[in-house]
């Protein structure tokens, strides 16, 4: 895929940061020495880590040069690097490994979770949040639109696979954790209109569908997709639309 756009991502910064804030609040580590933000993006989640643990050595990494550039401007005293979660390895044990809305993009993330647990210091925690919204109209319409387009062959394989059920993550992580907490939260975001929903997903879920297309194809796709979204998300009494956004949270603490 083309590089991620920090500016597009930050159009809905408050809404995107709220799940990270909810995840940070549930990490059962009071005085960590080293905290790492995997897939730190433009630094909005990293900022929460610095606020909760001001005395910790907080760092972050991402695969996107644009995201890292913005994160360094936002938090000049934090170390940010380009790295891939699937191959990253810390130089020494870490007390908190934090990953907000990253691992849904990595099909091999269950194996990566197991690796990351091995990088924790005793009493450390792995904290993960992933969108679990592939059955929502916002994402169903992406797949429907892709299948209808005359250039559908270009979009084969664009859709990411669904996440495993909660029981899978429990069975995967419980042998590795002294304490394991898994839960779902469905956020209901009031947005201006259907176009706002499209703007939201442009920087994330819609990106794999748009990147392979030329300008004319992209316009054709977006016109069709936006029309479907307008039908799927009717206006509320105040004229806005509600974007329902389910997410799964996993916090696994290693024995101390």
Curated annotation (Swiss-Prot):
Q: Which InterPro entries does this entry report, sorted A to Z?
A: SAM-dependent_MTases_sf, Trans-aconitate_MeTrfase, Trans_acon_MeTrfase_C
Return the broad EC class: transferase
Q: Name one GO molecular function term.
A: trans-aconitate 2-methyltransferase activity
What's one GO BP annotation on this UniProt entry?
methylation
Q: Does the keyword rRNA-binding apply?
A: no
Under catalytic activity, the entry for this protein gives: trans-aconitate + S-adenosyl-L-methionine = (E)-3-(methoxycarbonyl)pent-2-enedioate + S-adenosyl-L-homocysteine
Recorded GO cellular component terms are: cytoplasm
Keywords, alphabetical: Cytoplasm, Methyltransferase, S-adenosyl-L-methionine, Transferase
Q: Which residues cross the membrane?
A: none
**EC number(s) on file:** 2.1.1.144
* Methyltransferase found in the keyword field: yes
Q: Which domain of life is it from?
A: Bacteria
Give the UniProt subcellular location, in the record's own words.
Cytoplasm
Q: Which family does it belong to?
A: Belongs to the methyltransferase superfamily. Tam family.
**The protein's role, per its UniProt record:** Catalyzes the S-adenosylmethionine monomethyl esterification of trans-aconitate.
Q: What is this protein called?
A: Trans-aconitate 2-methyltransferase
């Amino acid at each position: 895929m083309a590089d991620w756009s920090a500016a597009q991502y930050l159009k809905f910064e408050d809404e995107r940061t709220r799940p990270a804030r909810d995840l940070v609040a549930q990490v059962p580590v009071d005085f960590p020495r080293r905290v790492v933000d995997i897939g730190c993006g433009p630094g909005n989640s990293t900022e929460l880590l610095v606020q909760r643990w001001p005395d910790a050595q907080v760092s972050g990494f991402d695969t996107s040069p644009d995201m890292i550039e913005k994160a360094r401007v936002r938090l000049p005293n934090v170390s940010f690097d380009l790295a891939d979660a699937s191959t990253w390895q810390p130089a020494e044990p870490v007390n908190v490994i934090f990953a907000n809305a990253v691992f849904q993009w990595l099909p091999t993330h269950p194996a990566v979770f197991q690796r990351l647990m091995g990088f924790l210091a005793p009493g450390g925690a792995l904290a993960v949040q992933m969108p679990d919204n592939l059955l929502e109209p916002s994402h169903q319409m992406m797949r429907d639109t892709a299948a209808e387009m005359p250039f559908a062959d270009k979009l084969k394989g664009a859709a990411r696979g669904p996440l495993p059920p909660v029981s899978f993550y429990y069975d995967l992580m419980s042998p590795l954790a002294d304490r394991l907490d898994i839960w779902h939260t469905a956020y209901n975001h009031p947005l201006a209109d259907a176009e706002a929903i499209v703007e939201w997903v442009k920087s994330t879920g819609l990106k794999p569908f748009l990147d392979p297309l030329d300008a004319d194809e992209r316009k054709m796709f977006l016109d069709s997709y936006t029309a479907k979204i307008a039908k799927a998300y009717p206006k509320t009494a105040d004229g806005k639309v509600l974007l329902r956004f389910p997410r799964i949270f996993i916090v696994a603490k290693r024995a101390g």
